[in-house]
């Protein structure tokens, strides 16, 4: 029997140590197996899904960014690189931001609102570098239809990137044009071509769908 004061300290400590150790020993292999299964499933879906899977992944990525749910994909990026040595998911998802660049250029050419033009000119350079939030919250989302057009443009680019099996050697962190520096050998030009197509598609969808030009 331990003194009451000592028992008060040691009981919770020992309980935590024992249960924590058991949990690590029992659950760590299970967690590893689940992570590997997710990575394998993602790779299989991209490999076999081709155009359709690429379009769906990229076309729905901007709404995920709005809610912050895209952060949940980080472990998948990590597992893909660890399991295969490359990441085929990130180049697909990066096309979502590229489609938005095209949409923003279309808005820039059509709008007569000086303030909106100024916002776009300030946000486009970082958009090209893969930082999409200024364009989302400052341009496409408030206008409505350009946001949809950006998603559609990204879907077109993502479909091609998936079909061409473009992959990067990094887990996450950069997107847009800088991502081209990390693309696997032999796929860089295909990534840049997909980038160009996504910009054009985002531009055309925005031009066709139109938008209500805000008053000054």
Where are the regions that the model predicts?
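Short hydrophobic alpha-helical membrane-embedded segments
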Residues: 69, 125-129, 171-172
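Long, highly hydrophobic alpha-helical transmembrane signal-anchor segments
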Residues: 54-75, 79, 88
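Transmembrane alpha-helical segments of multi-pass membrane transport proteins and ion-pumping complexes
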Residues: 12, 16-32, 62-71, 100-108, ...
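Short, amphipathic, aromatic/basic-enriched membrane-interface segments that mark the entry/exit
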Residues: 42-47, 61-68, 90-91, 118-122, ...
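Transmembrane alpha-helical segments and their short flanking loops
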Residues: 76, 122, 134-216
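Signature of multi-pass transmembrane helix bundles
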Residues: 1-60, 173-216
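Short coil/turn residues that cap or connect secondary-structure elements
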Residues: 2, 26-30, 68, 85, ...
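Helix-loop-helix junctions within the multi-pass membrane cores of secondary transporters/permeases
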Residues: 74-154
């Amino acid at each position: 029997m331990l003194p009451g004061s000592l028992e008060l300290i040691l009981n919770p400590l020992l309980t935590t140590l024992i249960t924590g150790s058991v949990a690590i020993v029992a659950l760590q292999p299970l967690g590893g197996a689940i992570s590997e299964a997710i990575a394998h499933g993602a790779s299989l879906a991209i490999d076999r899904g081709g155009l359709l899977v690429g379009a769906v992944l990229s076309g729905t990525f901007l709404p995920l960014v709005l809610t912050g749910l895209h952060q949940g994909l980080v472990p998948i990026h990590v597992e893909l690189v660890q399991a295969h040595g490359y990441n085929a998911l990130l180049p697909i998802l990066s096309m979502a931001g590229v489609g938005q660049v095209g949409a923003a250029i279309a808005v820039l050419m059509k709008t007569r609102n000086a303030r909106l033009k100024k916002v776009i000119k300030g946000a486009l350079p970082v958009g090209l570098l893969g930082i999409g939030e200024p364009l989302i919250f400052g341009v496409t989302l408030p206008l409505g239809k350009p946001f949809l057009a950006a998603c559609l443009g990204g879907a077109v680019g993502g479909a091609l990137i998936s079909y061409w099996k473009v992959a990067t050697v990094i887990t996450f962190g950069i997107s847009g044009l800088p991502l081209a520096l990390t693309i696997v050998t032999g796929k860089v030009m295909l990534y840049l071509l997909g980038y160009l197509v996504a910009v054009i598609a985002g531009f055309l969808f925005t031009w066709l769908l139109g938008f209500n030009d805000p008053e000054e």
